[in-house]
Amino acid sequence: MYEYLDRRYAVALYNIASAENKVEEYIADLKQINDLIKNNEDLNQIISNPKISTTKKREIFTSIFEDKIDLKLFSFLIILIEKKRIDQLTGIILQIEKVDLDNHNQVVAEVKTVVPLNNSERTALIDKLQIKYNKSIILREVIDKSIIGGVYVRVGDDVIDGTIKNKIEEMKKLMFIKG
């Protein structure tokens, strides 16, 4: 829903981080801050409570983070608080990671199999995906016994589902249509 705005904030922060050569540091810090907000019930309630003033939220963030993270990143978080966007931090992090991948001409491919790919399968898959997307591939392998067999690949919004589970589902649909 807020993807467009999240991307605008992400691009702005990415440009600052890139100029400072701190992209990885900023992403890591943002993830830690986001985890802290999510896992600390008190902080989460303060952030999400519209009755708590922006000034109070800014004071709390200042007391927690001011001297612990880069000043420009801290300023970015304060802007998010003032613009009432701090609750969208997860989406902003996802977008900044996408911007970073785009700028490095990379794409993440999530691959699900029942058993781990061997080296030749992995290399062949990466080669085919690099040709298809004309980008360097970051392969994230997931073992998923529920797919029964075959391979499932997701790159962005593209899905290649060559799993036995999917074939069974397709057969079930055909049986219901004809039956």
Swiss-Prot record:
Record membrane topology: Peripheral membrane protein
Disulfide bonds: none
Pfam families linked: OSCP
GO molecular function, one term: proton-transporting ATP synthase activity, rotational mechanism
Keyword Membrane: yes
Location of this chain's protein in the cell: Cell membrane
Keyword Cell membrane: yes
Keywords: ATP synthesis, Cell membrane, CF(1), Hydrogen ion transport, Ion transport, Membrane, Transport
Alphabetized Gene3D superfamilies for the sequence: N-terminal domain of the delta subunit of the F1F0-ATP synthase
GO CC annotations on file: plasma membrane; proton-transporting ATP synthase complex
Record note on quaternary structure: F-type ATPases have 2 components, F(1) - the catalytic core - and F(0) - the membrane proton channel. F(1) has five subunits: alpha(3), beta(3), gamma(1), delta(1), epsilon(1). F(0) has three main subunits: a(1), b(2) and c(10-14). The alpha and beta chains form an alternating ring which encloses part of the gamma chain. F(1) is attached to F(0) by a central stalk formed by the gamma and epsilon chains, while a peripheral stalk is formed by the delta and b chains.
Family assignment from sequence similarity: Belongs to the ATPase delta chain family.
Function noted in UniProt: F(1)F(0) ATP synthase produces ATP from ADP in the presence of a proton or sodium gradient. F-type ATPases consist of two structural domains, F(1) containing the extramembraneous catalytic core and F(0) containing the membrane proton channel, linked together by a central stalk and a peripheral stalk. During catalysis, ATP synthesis in the catalytic domain of F(1) is coupled via a rotary mechanism of the central stalk subunits to proton translocation. This protein is part of the stalk that links CF(0) to CF(1). It either transmits conformational changes from CF(0) to CF(1) or is implicated in proton conduction.
PANTHER family xref list: ATP SYNTHASE DELTA CHAIN (PTHR11910)
HAMAP family: ATP_synth_delta_bact (MF_01416)
Protein name as it appears in the record: ATP synthase subunit delta
Gene: atpH
